[in-house]
């Protein structure tokens, strides 16, 4: 009984150490990978306050198949 517990413990420790070794020595980003990445700028948007959907502006500013709706007091574009 003690031998089987010891064997299970040793196998567990080996699996855990292999997992940690793979995670620590994982793939690192190189300079060539970084050059291919995309960057995006985030711009703050003006928030339209509302009480109902009718308080929101026309939906032509939203993407196709979206409309302005009032959610928690703010006008947001929602999917149809």
UniProtKB/Swiss-Prot annotation:
This is Defensin-like protein 291. Keywords: Antimicrobial, Disulfide bond, Fungicide, Plant defense, Secreted, Signal. Residues 1-29 form the signal peptide. Disulfide bonds join 50-70, 56-75, 62-77. It comes from Arabidopsis thaliana (Mouse-ear cress). The keyword Nucleotide-binding does not apply. Belongs to the DEFL family. GO terms for biological process: defense response to fungus; killing of cells of another organism.
